Amino acid sequence: MKKIIIGNWKMNKTVHETRDFIQKFDIFYSKNLGKIKDNLDFAIAPSFTSLALISTSKIDKLKVAAQNLSQFDSGAFTGEISAKMLQDLAVHYVIIGHSERREIFKEIGEDLTNKILQAQKYNLIPVFCVGESLSEFEANETEKVIIGQINEVKSVLNFEKAIIAYEPIWAIGTGKTATAQIAEQVCKLIKNNFGKNIRVIYGGSVNSKNINELLLQKNIDGALVGKASLDPEEFVKILANI
């Protein structure tokens, strides 16, 4: 199964800063071309304002990902961005269910289900995020939480095409990383319960120093990278260290 790396920029980088990133990324990538495996997929999820710029990269393999989408198809929904609009911008992947969306914007199962349906309708690949809080982790409730989150959407999610991203909330942007063994255990849990051929990736303080150990695990098929993906040189190092 192909490994995949997706950079999630969150609410960072202006259009000008994105142009600068792409120029530097192209240079660093070309210099490290011999170190990057041919069977590696990779994408960047910038803010909506910079989506079109990712496609200006000279590196054809770099795909465009979106951080969110509307649960509605079109119409009077001020401020929303539809799946059709994303498709028109050559978006390949879309992140759904990130813990920040669940916690800050109170997205629940019904919202996520509708977003998945919209993504799949327009041939976008959902990157469905699951993860437990620190208190849930310490209470040994990880399995219950992860299985429960996937069960909420399993009736509509096309597991053969979708990606499941395991991101323990306690490891997002904290500098804390689940050990490779913990990440492997949860990714294996997901595959055992929902299908061996599902693409399952890990997210949570991933960088060029820990990416190799993480992806050496049998059931981890890639990574969702946050802060480290904002630096073009570091992002290329991640790709080269797999």
UniProtKB/Swiss-Prot annotation:
Q: Which reaction does it catalyse?
A: D-glyceraldehyde 3-phosphate = dihydroxyacetone phosphate
An example Pfam family from this entry, by short name, is: TIM
From what superkingdom does this record's organism come? Bacteria
Pathway note: Carbohydrate biosynthesis; gluconeogenesis; Carbohydrate degradation; glycolysis; D-glyceraldehyde 3-phosphate from glycerone phosphate: step 1/1
Which InterPro entries does this entry report, sorted A to Z?
Aldolase_TIM (IPR013785), TIM_sf (IPR035990), TrioseP_Isoase_bac/euk (IPR022896), Triosephosphate_isomerase (IPR000652), Triosephosphate_isomerase_AS (IPR020861)
| GO cellular component terms, semicolon-separated | cytosol
Identify which top EC class this enzyme belongs to.
Answer: isomerase
Sorted keywords for this record are: Cytoplasm, Gluconeogenesis, Glycolysis, Isomerase
Return the Gene3D superfamilies for the record: Aldolase class I (3.20.20.70)
Q: Which residues form a coiled coil?
A: none
* Biological role stated in the UniProt entry: Involved in the gluconeogenesis. Catalyzes stereospecifically the conversion of dihydroxyacetone phosphate (DHAP) to D-glyceraldehyde-3-phosphate (G3P).
Report what the protein is called.
Triosephosphate isomerase
The source organism is: Mesomycoplasma flocculare (Mycoplasma flocculare)
